[in-house]
Amino acid sequence: MTMGGTEKNVENKQYRLPREVKEALQAIASEWEDVIDSKALQVIPLKGAMTNEVFQIKWPTREKGPSRKVLVRIYGEGVEIFFDREDEIRTFEFMSKHGHGPLLLGRFGNGRIEEFLHARTLSACDLRDPEISGRIATRMKEFHGLEMPGAKKALLWDRLRNWLTACKRLASPEEAKSFRLDVMEMEINMLEKSLFDNDENIGFCHNDLQYGNIMMDEETKAITIIDYEYSCYNPVAYDIANHFCEMAADYHTETPHIMDYSKYPGVEERQRFLKTYMSYSDEKPSDTMVKKLLEDVEKYTLASHLIWGLWGIISEHVNEIDFDYMEYARQRFEQYWLTKPRLLAASEHK
């Protein structure tokens, strides 16, 4: 899970970038005539990242003009368990070429340099704003319609099984028992059987659409979806379900790992989002169509809880970022077991 950041109020001298990163940054800045000194860069760490270290880099310009800015992303340790970095970079480049994200300005051994988008990273409360939520719905529909290279095959179930294998390898016997990892393969099989539908809509999904991965231009109100580490083809109902689950999160509090499921969107809010989503580029959806998608989305929240629960366990063992991954995992699994009986009642005999 990656996050768009907010600036920390710190002295930049506390944060030293590797030499190869500085050299790459200086090479980029030397191409800009308005930069006074390519070596006079300011490093501002961005708060909230849980997979990578992210920094805003600024240079002063002549005649007191606006600073030149770029974004540096240093990849987190152990993330190759979650996704293939080369696949993610290819997705990033594809998105850039098709106007769906920042430009790739440079690469170095364990990271890259991106265009700094002059837009605001959304906050948790923005997701509840009807106007902003509607814009997210339409942008999401566009995203799902992207024709990406490769087979149009859902990867959700393979990813769940692969992450479960990693969990079993990394977790202590006590952790495995606490999280009931011994029954998880059976749960994944049951979910796939209950949720899979030959007629379901498969699209290119972000799979991590929380507020920190959404930016909005304050003037045009245009929405940009960023950070594609987990992006792949999947049921679109799953991607929407995951977005709804993220409304229970606020990663910029003193307890960023705590989820508040009282903030999960109500039926009317979910229906409004889905109607906007389905209306974009299509005819007005019937009530029956909206109801069907709503039911599918609700069931796919179970897959969201499982996958991010597994992610939390793995991250505890491979990631050094200051975040209570185990408590986060516990909450996601708890929500899975709590909601499963109600959500699968109608399909348990499928």
UniProtKB/Swiss-Prot annotation:
CDD domains listed in its UniProt record: ETNK_euk
InterPro entries: Kinase-like_dom_sf (IPR011009)
Keywords noted in UniProt: ATP-binding, Kinase, Lipid biosynthesis, Lipid metabolism, Nucleotide-binding, Phospholipid biosynthesis, Phospholipid metabolism, Transferase
Induction: By wounding, and salt and osmotic stresses.
Name of the top EC class for this enzyme: transferase
Keyword Nucleotide-binding in annotation: yes
Top-level taxonomic group: Eukaryota
EC number: 2.7.1.32
Protein residues bound to ATP: R73, Q210, D227
Similarity field: Belongs to the choline/ethanolamine kinase family.
Role played: Involved in phospholipid biosynthesis. Catalyzes the first step in phosphatidylcholine biosynthesis.
The name this protein goes by in its record: Probable choline kinase 2
Source organism (scientific name): Arabidopsis thaliana (Mouse-ear cress)
Organism lineage string: Eukaryota, Viridiplantae, Streptophyta, Embryophyta, Tracheophyta
